[in-house]
Amino acid sequence: MEEDQELERKMSGVKTSMAEGERKTALEMVQAAGTDRHCVTFVLHEEDHTLGNSLRYMIMKNPEVEFCGYTTTHPSESKINLRIQTRGALPAVEPFQRGLTDLMNVCQHVLDKFEASIKEYKDQKASRNEATF
């Protein structure tokens, strides 16, 4: 029971988002009857293969994860089902959260490198323009 409450506390920060003045669920956590917290399906609304495959890759890098896969429910629906199964005592929500954090860090690194390259290009272009005068 305490583990379930702890799991709910961890998930409470990412469950909902505000859309057009009303509360809309962005993420659902689904457990099949008879399963434990080590095998969970996360339903991510308004997402597609872009996040699904990237997140699956980041989660599978965790050696405690036995299985991670995702499916799109239907081409006309914007949601994915991401299933995580872990080994040992690690609840599935932890690699999910770590995968999101790791993916955000990778995206931030790519953005930083991209912006630095743009700045370097503009600086080089400006110095070439000054040299021609």
From Swiss-Prot:
Assigned keywords, A-Z: Acetylation, DNA-directed RNA polymerase, Nucleus, Transcription
Species lineage: Eukaryota, Metazoa, Chordata, Craniata, Vertebrata
Gene3D superfamilies linked to this entry: RNA polymerase, RBP11-like subunit
A single GO BP: transcription by RNA polymerase III
InterPro entries named in the record: RBP11-like, RBP11-like_dimer, RNA_pol_Rpb11_13-16kDa_CS, RNAP_AC19, Rpo11-like
Record-given protein name: DNA-directed RNA polymerases I and III subunit RPAC2
Modified residue annotations for N-acetylmethionine: M1
Region ranges (Disordered): 1-22
Description of how the protein assembles with itself and partners: Component of the RNA polymerase I and RNA polymerase III complexes consisting of at least 13 and 17 subunits, respectively.
